[in-house]
Amino acid sequence: MVRRLLKRGVTAGAVLVGAEAAYAVLRPVPKLAEFNPSGTFGQPHLPPLRVAVLGDSSVTAPGVASTEEIWVSRVCTRLAESRHVILRSFAVSGSRVADLVESQLEPTLAFFPDLVLVAVGANDVIRGVSLRSFESRLEELVAVLADTDALVILSGVGDMGTIPRLHPPLQNMMSRRSERFDRVHHMVAARYGAHVLEHRADDPETWYTDRGLWSSDLFHVSAAGHERWADVAWRTL
């Protein structure tokens, strides 16, 4: 009986967090253009490198002025110094990990990538997805990707308490919740030989205090934020 009540309490808490976070993030905001960073980088005579990115608005990048400013485009530009990079993005704004499994995984496999970048977790955190469900679906996704010859890199989940649109106590709740989801990224990656971007190693105080890293909607990052994300990704690559 006690266990059942505790389970209900945890579920209700997740729903409440999801509802409050969704309201904070989805209430009327400036509508920002989104982008598809797919394209080619570098000279055609160089050895080819096929890069696939699955994800959410961290890839479609509302808040930047052009595709060149998106973190994955910046990474591909650096890779193109020695490779002919073919980037294909399957990312859709608002996606949760279940959406990646159900809608983005199949076309990714058909692309036969050499490198796969998986940027997911923020929407699961915000919308009250349970940690157990997130882990199950992320493992389902990574298990399939790891069964290919591709190098798989997960985004992890940064400190979402830094988002300017969030205020205490929701800010603190999102910070703790996002840390748990980040740990899931690391656990799943370790099981399948994947890697995780260390966004949390990037100075958190700067993300809390520098509004220049955020776009006008105070939720998505700006071009300056994408530049920092690209630096984090490049250190892993």
Where are these regions (language model features)?
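A short helix->loop->beta-strand "cap" motif at the edges of active sites that frequently abuts
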Residues: D147-L151
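A generic structural signal for well-ordered alpha-helical segments
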Residues: A80, L145, V188-A190
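Residue-level recognition of beta-strand->loop/alpha-helix junctions
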Residues: S89-A91, G156, E198-A201
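Alpha/beta-hydrolase-fold catalytic nucleophile elbow
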Residues: A119, S155-G156
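Generic structural signal for well-ordered alpha-helices
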Residues: L138-V142, D182
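Catalytic His-Asp segment of secreted/periplasmic serine-dependent ester chemistry enzymes
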Residues: G161-L237
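Conserved SGNH/GDSL esterase-like catalytic core that processes O-acyl groups on lipids
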Residues: P48-A52, S58-S136
